[in-house]
Amino acid sequence: MADEAAVEASFAETLDVFGRVDSCFANAGVARSGRFDETTTKEWRAVLDVNLDGLFYTLRAAAGHMRARAEAGDAGGRLIGTASLGALMGMARVEAYGASKGAVISMMQALAVEYARFGVTANSVLPGHIETAMTADNYANEKFANAVLPRIPIRRWGDRSDFEAIAVYLMSDASSYHTGDSLLIDGGFFIN
C-alpha cells in the first residue's frame, strides 16, 4: 500500500475487471517497536508510509470514483479504514503506529462529512487484540497473555471472523445511515 503508483494501477485494474467499486476497505498496518528517542526518521516514515500514506492512496482512488459516479447520477459507496485500539490508548514503544492509526480515525471522520452528499459513508474499524500474522508472537508469549487476556471481559483473543463481520456490516446497505464512526472490536478491553 505504500507504493502510490502500484495502488493506482491496482485500482484501475479493479475497475477494468468489475466496472465499479461500491466499497473500499483500506486494511493494512505495520508496527515497529522500540524506544521513541531512538526511533530514526526512516523507521518512523516506514510505519506512516503504509499505515497512513497507503490508506490515503487507496481511499483517494475509491472516493474519486464514488464521487464521479454520484455526479453521473449513481450515488453511494462505503469507505472503511483500519485504525487500532492503539489510537485510543497510550502504548509505549509503538508511537509511530499509534500516531498513524489516530490519524486514520480523523481522516475517516473528515471523509464522512465531505462525501456524505455523494451517498458515501466512511467509518474506521479499531481492532484490539485480534490474532493475525502481525500479532502472533505477542499472543504466544505467556507473560503477555497473562497480563492482557484477563483484561478482556470476553476472555479470548479476537479472531479474523470478528473483524470480518464488522467489515461486512459496514459495506452493506444496513450501514447506510452509519457514518463517521470508529468501531472498536476488542472484546471489551478498552472499557475494562
Ranges and model annotations:
Residues 64, 113-114, 176:
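Alpha-helical segment proximal to the catalytic Tyr-Lys
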Residues 59, 100, 108:
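Active-site helix of classical SDR
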Residues 25, 116-121, 178-180:
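Short, small/polar-rich loop/turn modules that mediate ligand/substrate recognition or access, typified
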Residues 36-37, 89-95, 117-118, 155, ...:
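Active-site loop immediately N-terminal to the catalytic Tyr-X3-Lys motif
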Residues 84:
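Residue(s) in the substrate-gating loop at a strand-loop-helix junction
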Residues 35-36, 43-48, 148:
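Substrate-binding pocket helix/loop in short-chain dehydrogenase/reductase
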Residues 156-185, 190:
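C-terminal substrate-recognition "lid" of short-chain dehydrogenase/reductases
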